[in-house]
Amino acid sequence: MKTFDIMTDLILYVHGKGGIAAECEHYRPLFPDCEVFGLDYQTFTPWETGAEIHAAVEKLNTEYENIILIANSIGAFFSMSAGIDSMIRKAYFISPIVDMEKLIGNMILWANVTEAELKAKGVIRTEFGEDLSWDYLCYVRQHPIQWSVPTSILYGSSDTLTSLETVRTFAEQHNAALTVMEGGEHWFHTEEQTHFLDDWIRKEGWFGCAKRSFC
């Protein structure tokens, strides 16, 4: 059993698509004795963003005794693609993308195209605002997720990007604790959803880092 000292622990927030690093401020009151830092990554592929996250965590790891990760949506996927397992003490994933290959496959169906077309064109712009990339799909297939960090997952039953079956399979394979909010969306943004999120973090057992024990 270990006791953590004031300000030796960092809450690292990795936002999702369309998010901003400043969203980390929401979590500051939940961890009053921790430093809180939002990572403002500049790239949007797992190989580039993963490298950004790895470099940032590697530097932060020299400054803090423990890093606790909070990652939202694709931010969780990018974080798991970054090779940072050994530097993260605990992870909270909110609406995480845990099977990018399956999501891309679904988007290919939604766009009414085929893998052969995507391979031939390289990139296909869709009507729903996402660019499908053959290089991206190939990278995902060639680099399956490796993740060994103690992780808690919050999932909304009305999430349209990831199915409950997919997130449950991931949780079982990685011994992650899964909490499902009935009626919750992919984006936890309403007052009810935000309160549920905050209560979930409190119940997960790292409410404030000062002099807390963690087994």
Question: Which residue ranges define each predicted feature?
Answer:
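Aromatic pocket-lining residues of Rossmann-like dinucleotide-binding sites
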Residues: 82-83
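Short, surface-exposed alpha-helical segments at coil->helix boundaries
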Residues: 21-28, 50, 163-168
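Short, surface-exposed "cap/lid" segments of acyl-processing enzymes
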Residues: 2-44
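Short hydrophobic segments within beta-strands
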Residues: 12-17, 70, 94, 154
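The alpha/beta-hydrolase serine catalytic core
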Residues: 87-169, 173-180, 184-215
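Glycine-rich phosphate-binding loop signature in dinucleotide/nucleotide-binding domains
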Residues: 5-6, 60-65, 147, 204
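Gly/Ala-rich beta-loop-alpha elbow adjacent to hydrolase catalytic centers
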Residues: 70-79
